Amino acid sequence: GMITTATYGFWFLANGHYSFASISLCLSSTLVGFIYYNFSKDNKIFMGDTGSLILGFIITTLTVKFIHFNVTHTFKIDGLVSAPVVSIALLSVPIFDTLRVFYLRIMRKKSPFKADRLHMHHLFVDNGFSHMQTSFMFYGYTIATSSLTYFLRQYLSNTELCVFLIGLFALYIILGNILEQKRLDAKIAS
């Protein structure tokens, strides 16, 4: 969320949408505070379900406005015909994780809304990565995917960019399966 809201914030700022820039950059700054405290050994802040839902609602609203402004307005910087695909790239971690987890739960005849440890961050932590390492892997992935999608938009159509993101989703699923199998193997061995 921090990278996505910061990206939207700077884009809104560069294009004169100051109210949305303020919302985006304030939210991004707030999330930096969460990261600061949650990576310390002594202090922790728990956002909870309500905080996560509000965060998701605000990011969804900012995403809709980002796409809308790219379709309907004149810009100080180049307009993004590929704004929907760039938004998907910015939000690929939660989108991919939700799709993967819902699919696995349904295939296992469980409610897609019942909590479990199938989320990718649980798989990384259960395989020996720290919370900090896992978080920075997700940050790096989000920055790399978004930057690459933004760069490739000059050379590829939106359809080709979608195929690129579907390929990344396939790799995400494969990685999740590998991590889940390693977790099962470790459980059996112990």
Regions found by a protein language model. Give the residues of each.
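Alpha-helical transmembrane segments
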Residues: 1-127, 131-190
